[in-house]
Amino acid sequence: KDVWVVVFLALVSWVLLKLPAIWGQINEELFYQRGLAIIVFNGIILFTMWQNRDFNKKNILTYGLPLAFVALFISLLPKSGGDSIVLALIHTPLFLWCLFGLAYMGFDYKNMHKRMAFIRFNGELLIMTGLILIAGAMLTGITIGLFSAISMDIEHFYVEYIATLIGMAAPLVSLYLIGLNPTLTRKIAPVIARTF
């Protein structure tokens, strides 16, 4: 069941990411500057809540209201401005990361053990997501190379659609794999540490 939730959230995130291409009136640069973090973290937070089965009214409001406020605030910022807009854009993913932490802890922010577990989990998530993205980049290179060998140029299509879908799915797949096998990244991390 979790696999289908991952697929659904990845597809929804990907469709939201492609909104400027679907609806030509959206300024692509502004959209990605202001909306990318919201799209990515929204999928991650929703899947975390799904894993924890935390969809009660209080938790939905605790997650939904701040997210809606941030999305509205960011969208209403002037198109061009000074350092205050840059700072707002920098702090948006940090704020969303805090919301992700709340969701991971089951909204029990007073529990110190859960706080420490979340800090540790971030490292595991980064490692797993990084490995998936590296594998995706290798797959992209191999696929484009194979099609080039038969004189078919699919680079634009692949990067525009498939690669972006892989990018949206990577953190969600990482969450799923870590939930499925929590010791997986703990075995990988020492190998990476010894390698570098």
For every predicted segment, state its role.
Residues 7-20, 61-76, 169-174:
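Hydrophobic core of alpha-helical transmembrane segments in multi-pass integral membrane proteins
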Residues 140-141, 172-176:
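Extracytosolic (periplasmic/ER-lumenal) interhelical loops and adjacent juxtamembrane/interface segments
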Residues 1-46:
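N-terminal signal-anchor module of multipass membrane proteins
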Residues 3-7, 12-15, 40, 70, ...:
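Extended aliphatic helical segments
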Residues 25-34, 44-166, 180-194:
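Membrane-interface helix-loop-helix junctions at boundaries between adjacent transmembrane segments
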